[in-house]
Amino acid sequence: MVVQTEPDVNSMLEEKVQYAKDLIADTIKKYPCVGVACSFGKDSMVTVHVARQVDPSIKIFAVMTQFKPPETLEYLRKMNDLWDLNTTVYMVADKVPDILNSKTLTVRLLPTDEFKTKSAETEKKYRDKIYTVVPDECCRILKVEPTKLAVANLDAWICGLRNTEGRTRVDYQYVEDKGGLIKVNPILTFTETDVWKYIALNGIPSHPWYGQGYRSLGCAPCSHPGGILERDGRWIGTSKCGGECGIHTQKLK
């Protein structure tokens, strides 16, 4: 049996990081308009950190929802200011959350009519919340449609997807052509251990929910701690359990 030593593990991580940098550099060179999607989870923060070493001024965008926990919005504000990210936030909401009222953030509010109508219809028919009964529809309105706006003027977008996160991500590739929109996954082969090692080595502050046992962060009602795979805690008790919100499975252009 071959046992990897600490230097071996560190060397492997260094190689993965360098590959990620090279891939991002190639993407920026090849495509005129590139942006980084950031959920402000651990994988996104590693991706943003790596990308900004290649291009400190690269565009950062985030899609937030009314169901994101306050800790996520607070962490977004904290990291945006700490790293001077100038993040553009897309959000289906009537007003900007107080914590996101900042000159260093651009918040694009999107119409709420469809979500309010669908929510009311669902609660009237099923006596339950839209995210419980029809989570795909909830995610479509609050996440997928805003993401379409976020990438509308991009030639390529960079994501923090990893193929060991869950059952739905094992077949992703480093570079994917999604109907004319290029998606790049530079940390695709990072393990969960790689991510936390990178965070520790680079002194990156982490979202407080990770300290409570969460391994994958989303909206508060649809995220739970624990799980064999990282995404097992997402959408528990629904047809989407451990699955995807839709932004990586649906055509965005």
Q: Where on the chain are the PLM-derived regions?
A:
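Nucleotide-activated chemistry modules centered on ATP-dependent adenylation/adenylyltransferase
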Residues: V2-K253
